Curated annotation (Swiss-Prot):
Binding-site positions, heme b b562: H83, H182
Binding site for heme b b566: H97, H196
Protein keywords: Electron transport, Heme, Iron, Membrane, Metal-binding, Mitochondrion, Mitochondrion inner membrane, Respiratory chain, Transmembrane, Transmembrane helix, Transport, Ubiquinone
Topological category with respect to the lipid bilayer: Multi-pass membrane protein
Chain's role: Component of the ubiquinol-cytochrome c reductase complex (complex III or cytochrome b-c1 complex) that is part of the mitochondrial respiratory chain. The b-c1 complex mediates electron transfer from ubiquinol to cytochrome c. Contributes to the generation of a proton gradient across the mitochondrial membrane that is then used for ATP synthesis.
Gene Ontology BP, a term: mitochondrial electron transport, ubiquinol to cytochrome c
Claim: Methyltransferase is one of the keywords in the record: no
Cellular-component GO terms for this entry: mitochondrial inner membrane; respiratory chain complex III
Cofactor note as given: Binds 2 heme b groups non-covalently.
Cofactor requirements of the protein: heme b
Source organism: Cryptotis mexicana
Assembly: The cytochrome bc1 complex contains 11 subunits: 3 respiratory subunits (MT-CYB, CYC1 and UQCRFS1), 2 core proteins (UQCRC1 and UQCRC2) and 6 low-molecular weight proteins (UQCRH/QCR6, UQCRB/QCR7, UQCRQ/QCR8, UQCR10/QCR9, UQCR11/QCR10 and a cleavage product of UQCRFS1). This cytochrome bc1 complex then forms a dimer.
Transmembrane segments: 33-53, 77-98, 113-133, 178-198, 226-246, 288-308, 320-340, 347-367
Protein name: Cytochrome b
Length: 379
């Protein structure tokens, strides 16, 4: 009898994606983050679904409905903190996944990479709207500040902001539509992730050496299924420890105060995973310039394949580029730290220097260094 997984139309797709998929024999644990992001997305959709059963998207009751979830719903506190900290785990995996792509030259798969950049924007939009929903002080003021940035767009800016708000300020209409979008976007992300995988499987995975692995493939199952399960268990361990021991470690205390339009918090700042972009935004004194820099800080990833000047794909055999890559990582950590600091000396100048270094490394220094490495190897 013919094996059902190779003949059944639905099973065939699963089989060719997760069972009989030919995978390079030398991919390291850095290749685990794709599956971990899938696990994170499933956790977020499931916990979000149960939260939505008890949440009300009305300015009068949103804050108290979240309180009700934590106090009165069976294991509501657990679901709420799994969802909040699950977002942090999601972004940790995302940043490591993108970093892996930059280091090993995975961006040379253009379609896969560009859909990945689109996914990054979609996840950031979803996280931003989700942060508004508890309707605490930082939710309200974060929404006000970030949506207000669109007013920097010439001619249509102020109309666009009012259109998004559904009025003349962040209010009930804004909260309701943010809840609607926050609910639907994860399913759009899941669909995009499917397309991301589709394009990846057209070419096959990259590997640490950046060389073709066609001559040395192994089946995905059992080798990489067991490896991915180990990764998922470690992710679950970290998330569980975070949720059960210090669930508010990554949150903002201001969000435990109900939203008050008449009282501005002393330091308005987004969640930790947006701080690097927020620091770049704040480092430019001009409003439109800041908004453009903010968008470009992420959009620059789409131009990385065009800036690849090396004859080698991966950084595995390129020590100079490796050094610059880790300087870039340190720079991003510096920007994240600066984003959480008040706008005063010396943080302003540190933020400006870190922002200049960020764009200089990606646009100028790394491509030139790659050319130097080519010459050193007489290529």
């Amino acid at each position: 009898m013919t094996n059902i997984r190779k003949t059944h139309p639905l099973m065939k797709i699963i089989n060719s994606s997760f069972i009989d998929l030919p995978a390079p024999s030398n991919i390291s644990s850095w290749w685990n983050f794709g599956s971990l992001l899938g696990v994170c997305l499933i956790i977020q959709i499931l916990t979000g679904l149960f939260l939505a059963m008890h949440y009300t998207s009305d300015t009068m009751t949103a804050f108290s409905s979240v309180t009700h979830i934590c106090r009165d719903v069976n294991y509501g506190w657990l679901i709420r903190y799994l969802h909040a900290n699950g977002a942090s785990m999601f972004f940790i995996c995302l940043f490591l996944h993108v970093g892996r792509g930059l280091y090993y030259g995975s961006y040379m798969f253009m379609e896969t990479w560009n859909i990945g950049v689109l996914l990054l924007f979609a996840v950031m939009a979803t996280a931003f709207m989700g942060y508004v929903l508890p309707w605490g002080q930082m939710s309200f003021w974060g929404a006000t500040v970030i949506t207000n940035l669109l007013s920097a767009i010439p001619y249509i800016g102020s109309d666009l902001v009012q259109w998004i708000w559904g009025g003349f300020s962040v209010d009930k209409a804004t909260l309701t539509r943010f809840f609607a979008f926050h609910f639907i976007l994860p399913f759009v992300i899941a669909a995009l992730a499917g397309v991301h995988l589709l394009f990846l499987h057209e070419t096959g995975s990259n590997n640490p050496s950046g060389l073709s692995s066609d001559a040395d493939k192994i089946p995905f199952h059992p080798y990489y299924t067991i490896k991915d399960i180990l990764g998922a268990l470690l992710l679950a361990l970290v998330l569980t420890c975070l949720v059960l021991f210090s669930p508010d470690l990554l949150g903002d205390p201001d969000n435990y105060t109900p939203a008050n339009p008449l009282n501005t918090p002393p330091h308005i700042k987004p969640e930790w995973y947006f701080l690097f972009a927020y620091a770049i935004l704040r480092s430019i004194p001009n409003k439109l310039g800041g908004v453009l820099a903010l968008v470009l800080s992420i959009l620059i990833l789409a131009f990385i394949p065009l800036l690849h000047t090396s004859k080698q794909r991966s950084m595995m055999f390129r020590p100079l580029s490796q050094c610059l890559f880790w300087i870039l990582v340190a720079d991003l950590l510096t920007l994240t730290w600066i984003g959480g600091q008040p706008v005063e000396h010396p943080f302003i100048i540190i933020g400006q220097l870190a922002s200049i270094l960020y764009f200089s490394l990606l646009l100028v220094i790394m491509p030139i260094t790659s050319l130097i490495e080519n010459n050193m190897l007489k290529w």
